Swiss-Prot record:
It comes from the Bacteria. The gene is tsf. SUPFAM superfamilies: Elongation factor Ts (EF-Ts), dimerisation domain, UBA-like. It comes from Bradyrhizobium sp. (strain ORS 278). This is Elongation factor Ts. It is found in: Cytoplasm. One of its GO terms (cellular component) is cytoplasm. Associates with the EF-Tu.GDP complex and induces the exchange of GDP to GTP. It remains bound to the aminoacyl-tRNA.EF-Tu.GTP complex up to the GTP hydrolysis stage on the ribosome. GO terms for molecular function: translation elongation factor activity. Pfam families: EF_TS. Belongs to the EF-Ts family.
Length: 307
């Protein structure tokens, strides 16, 4: 039997909003599997939403930079937020974004690229020596279109183009560049706020869609609903799900009375041509990284020789 810890119960509560005893039961029933426990709670109707429990704790900055038809977003991590506010580190992030715009999104190629007489990797090493704290280029992404624009938005910017969250959006269109750029920035802001998982339903991971269908089916099957009724409920539930997680079906944050798809269609007249979302990338600082928590009481006890 898996050892169910208080920390596991706490994490499940934070990600689902379910009660403590329900969370403990879910973890016990699923052998401590956090994802399976979230599904178990949803099937029992005990969780309103199964948001992924992503404890984001890494520090640093997200840098986003565009130039006409191409754009990049990079994540450079540091150990503390203090370093993220350091002008030298901020300059490093902007320099790395510029290099990525020139050479592409391959992290190893970025690190090997030269800026002046030294490589980016050497510049990072120099920054570590100067500031006295570890820093690293974690990831990078790039978008490019043959016709249209790539726009960006940085939320919580500490300097232009660098902050805690960065988005780039690629729009393909033969229309007016200035109008497209303004629309692209609005769309990038939408992506930052709404966090879509794909452009449309076709872009979603089939396994994720299957899991959603299974959760909905099992939930209503446990309630004793007939199979023909369950099929209709699941179909309706998936439509709602798509409106929540796909960009084109989400309510546009700048005009909630329209979907993003409708807003783009209406903008085509102003832009002067058809508009297609070719892609988007959203980087939130530290997502997927867990920062080691310090137990100060334990450290003090260890230092004093206490057990």
């Amino acid at each position: 039997m898996a050892n169910i810890t208080a920390a596991m119960v706490k994490d499940l509560r934070e990600s689902t909003g379910a009660g403590m005893m329900d969370c403990k039961a879910a973890l016990t029933e699923t052998g401590g599997d956090m994802q399976a426990a979230q599904d178990w709670l949803r099937k029992k109707g005990l969780s309103k939403a199964a948001k992924k429990a992503g404890r984001v704790a890494a520090e640093g900055l997200i840098g986003a930079l565009t130039s006409g038809k191409k754009g990049v977003v990079v994540e450079v991590n540091s150990e503390t937020d203090f370093v993220a506010r350091n002008e030298h580190f901020q300059g490093l992030v902007k320099m790395i974004a510029q290099v990525a715009l020139d050479v592409g999104a391959d992290v190893e190629k970025i690190k090997a690229a030269k800026v002046g007489s030294i490589t980016v990797e050497a510049a990072i090493a120099d920054s570590i020596a100067t500031i006295g704290e570890n820093q690293s280029l974690r990831r990078a992404a790039a978008l490019e279109v043959s016709e249209g624009v790539v726009a960006s938005y940085v939320h919580g910017a500490v300097i232009e183009g660098a902050g805690k969250l960065g988005v780039i959006v690629a729009l393909e269109s033969p229309g007016k560049t200035d109008e497209l750029a303004a629309l692209g920035r609005q769309l990038a802001m939408h992506v930052a706020a709404a966090n879509p998982q794909a452009i449309d339903a076709a872009g979603l991971d089939p396994e994720v869609v299957k899991r959603e269908k299974d959760v909905l089916s099992d939930k209503y099957r446990q309630q004793g609903k007939p199979e023909n009724v369950i099929e209709k409920i699941v179909e309706s539930g998936l439509k709602t799900y798509y409106k929540e997680v796909t960009l084109l079906e989400q309510a546009f944050i700048h005009d909630s009375g329209k979907s993003v798809a409708q807003a783009l269609k209406e903008a085509e007249g102003k832009v002067g041509g058809p508009i297609k979302v070719a892609g988007f990338v959203r980087y939130a600082l530290g997502e997927g990284i867990e920062k080691e928590e310090t137990d100060f009481a334990a450290e003090v006890a260890a230092a004093s020789g206490k057990k």
